Amino acid sequence: MRMMVAGGGTGGHVFPGIALAEEVVTRHPANDVVFVGTARGLEASVVPAAGFPIELIEVKGLKGKGIAGALLNLLLLPRAFLQSWRILKRWRPDVVVGVGGYASGPVVLTAWAMRIPTAVQEQNAIAGLTNRLLGRVVKAAFTAFPEAARHFAARKVYQLGNPIRRRLMENYMRPESAHGQPRLLVFGGSQGAHALNMRVIEALPHLADLRERIQITHQTGARDREYVEKGYRACGFTPDVREFIDDMSAAYAGCDLVVCRAGATTLAELTVCKKPSILVPFPAAADNHQVKNARSLVDAGAAVMIEERDLTGEVLAREIREILDAPERRERMARAAGRLGSPQAAKEIADVCMELVRRRWGSPFGQAREPGQKPARPPDLAS
């Protein structure tokens, strides 16, 4: 089976696609996966690093661009559809899965027009605009939250959760090494979160008595690293401050409490890894979907939510202290998180995709092609 994964832009779209791709290629040596994204998106760097080929198209978003910006970006759409058609003709995928983001629209629509089975994977509680539009033509809509189902025809919905990267799953299944000091993990997504970084530094004076009893790992993003390091040192803390955490599995395995945003992929990782959390939803997220995402964990007793408008150093310090000082509460939160986890999401989504392929092509392995046959890359893909 050859799968094409279209979309990206942010880690929340890209990483579930990579997790699904990892599941597909491990099933059979003849299976392969190709991604389609944009040069500006995170996918342009992380997909090749994960070992998968990627093709690029030229497309930009329409929402929130204003009338002039939307019109200019509309002019790119015919070119994006032509590029998508050429890519689909070369790769001849058996199924195309859109994971959200600008690139998924032209690719999935073109695949549908070419009678290739299509699906979308919606990570959030409120479906994104692109996935809502594509939901009208795709064969399947994979969701992670019950609230997202209302955006799609009931017959198309498979509520299976968000796929988690294989490396995170494998590393987390190893026994954790014992550690005496409470460990706090702070991160704001792949780019960091400026407001969250600032509030953590403001919280430190209120946690001064814990400086010898707590270990902190803090992903800041490139912009704030130097300032955050100075802030910790000024308050007598000796944390592990990084611009970016390459091995999130090790970071999760070594912590007792997580302070982070409420992106859907992050929450999927928290639940599979059974980690208590303090969630600070990103206030500018489309349709305020991070608040909706976070509420699912809060209502289950797995997390505490502080909206950014209410976030101060003192408030954050109080929540951190209350959770770290209460091992039994942490254990209850961890169990609650685990009950929400979907460790089999990638496997179950791949199962449905193989069934779509079987219905269309008569075999779960898809169209007949020579073993290992891949298209030659043209000199100018964007032409």
Swiss-Prot record:
Pfam families: Glyco_tran_28_C, Glyco_transf_28. The keyword Cell inner membrane applies. One of its GO terms (cellular component) is plasma membrane. The keyword Lyase does not apply. Its main location: membrane. It is a peripheral membrane protein. Pathway: Cell wall biogenesis; peptidoglycan biosynthesis. GO terms for molecular function: UDP-N-acetyl-D-glucosamine:N-acetylmuramoyl-L-alanyl-D-glutamyl-meso-2,6-diaminopimelyl-D-alanyl-D-alanine-diphosphoundecaprenol 4-beta-N-acetylglucosaminlytransferase activity; undecaprenyldiphospho-muramoylpentapeptide beta-N-acetylglucosaminyltransferase activity. It catalyses: di-trans,octa-cis-undecaprenyl diphospho-N-acetyl-alpha-D-muramoyl-L-alanyl-D-glutamyl-meso-2,6-diaminopimeloyl-D-alanyl-D-alanine + UDP-N-acetyl-alpha-D-glucosamine = di-trans,octa-cis-undecaprenyl diphospho-[N-acetyl-alpha-D-glucosaminyl-(1->4)]-N-acetyl-alpha-D-muramoyl-L-alanyl-D-glutamyl-meso-2,6-diaminopimeloyl-D-alanyl-D-alanine + UDP + H(+). PANTHER family: GLYCOSYLTRANSFERASE, UDP-N-ACETYLGLUCOSAMINE--N-ACETYLMURAMYL-(PENTAPEPTIDE) PYROPHOSPHORYL-UNDECAPRENOL N-ACETYLGLUCOSAMINE TRANSFERASE 1. This is UDP-N-acetylglucosamine--N-acetylmuramyl-(pentapeptide) pyrophosphoryl-undecaprenol N-acetylglucosamine transferase.
